[in-house]
Structure formats: structure tokens, C-alpha cells
Amino acid sequence: MMEKSKPNVVFVLGGPGSGKGTQCANIVRDFGWVHLSAGDLLRQEQQSGSKDGEMIATMIKNGEIVPSIVTVKLLKNAIDANQGKNFLVDGFPRNEENNNSWEENMKDFVDTKFVLFFDCPEEVMTQRLLKRGESSGRSDDNIESIKKRFNTFNVQTKLVIDHYNKFDKVKIIPANRDVNEVYNDVENLFKSMGF
């Protein structure tokens, strides 16, 4: 019997407001991948009223990173629920501990291909987020939370990107452009990788 091939995973990283969600939606539409947003999974869990939910709520509001094992468990459940698919994991791993937990718990189940990094200047992201905050109703689209999220990204998430860079597994996309120009690069990258 042939061994079932492991699903491919691409980590989608970039500062808050760099356009990760928008670009993931395009990849889903054109390549049939499943988009797993760590933040969305955590927000759903928070609303489910589980015991993890309350802790998650407090941490998100404070711009803190939820314990890795909680997020990895939610991601693994979502991957198990979508057999035979490839996955975009958006907004994770946010720090080295996240990444270590992912590698310990997931390396036998998935093939982590590369990090898709949307590189965008902070002032551009801030403008986008404040605009989104007018309509999104997200508790973290305000200037205080935004500053904390940039800090988390600059201090912690960049170390994850450096880690994957050592293995030549980071694809950088300049994201301070028209959304269609950005996607053009993404689409060409995915085609060149044989997806």
C-alpha cells in the first residue's frame, strides 16, 4: 500500500495589516488550499465558551501570544478535518516557542514547505489597520493593540523568519503595493513550486 503523502503547509507571516488574509483568500480561490488563520481559530475557540476560551480572550486583548500547545492543537484539529488538502497557516508561528511546539507535534503529519513573508513598512500597516478597525469590530484594531502587535512581530516573529532563512525556506513578497501586483508575485511563486 502506498504511503499517503503528507499535506503541504506554508506559513504565511507578515506584520499585522500586511495583507496576509487578503492574499490567502486568493490562493484558496486559485489553488484550492485551505486557509487556517491561527487568530481566527483562537477567536472561534474563545467564543465556544471552553476553558481555554477565557484565557485566550484575555491574552488576545492584551496583545500577548497564546500558549503554543493550545494553538498547535487547534491547527492540528483543523488539518485532520480537511484530509487530502494543502494548508496556508496564517499568523503562526509567532515566536520560537510556537515554532518548536509545531516541529515537535507536527513534523510527522505535515510537510512544512516554506514561509511566505509579506514585507511591509509599519506606517502603511498602521493606516490599513486603523481603516479596518472602523468596520471590523476586532478588539485588537486600535492604536494601543496595534503597537503591541508590531512589537511582538518585530521582537519575536522576525526570529522565526530568521530561523527558516537559514534553511533557505523564506519567500519574501514586498507588500507595500497594489493588492493585485502583490498577488501576481504570489501566484507566480506557487506555480513555480509546482502547486
UniProtKB/Swiss-Prot annotation:
Its EC number is 2.7.4.14. Pfam families: ADK. This is UMP-CMP kinase. HAMAP family: Adenylate_kinase_Adk, Adenylate_kinase_UMP_CMP_kin. CMP binds at residue 98. CDD domains: ADK (cd01428). The lineage of its organism: Eukaryota, Amoebozoa, Evosea, Eumycetozoa, Dictyostelia. Its cofactor is Mg(2+). ATP binds at residues 17-22, 132, 177. Residues 131-141 are annotated as: LID. One of its GO terms (cellular component) is cytoplasm. SUPFAM superfamilies: P-loop containing nucleoside triphosphate hydrolases. Binds 1 Mg(2+) ion per monomer. The Mg(2+) ion binds to water and substrates. It comes from the Eukaryota. Keywords: ATP-binding, Cytoplasm, Kinase, Nucleotide-binding, Nucleus, Pyrimidine biosynthesis, Transferase. One of its GO terms (biological process) is pyrimidine nucleobase salvage. It is found in: Cytoplasm; Nucleus. Consists of three domains, a large central CORE domain and two small peripheral domains, NMPbind and LID, which undergo movements during catalysis. The LID domain closes over the site of phosphoryl transfer upon ATP binding. Assembling and dissambling the active center during each catalytic cycle provides an effective means to prevent ATP hydrolysis.
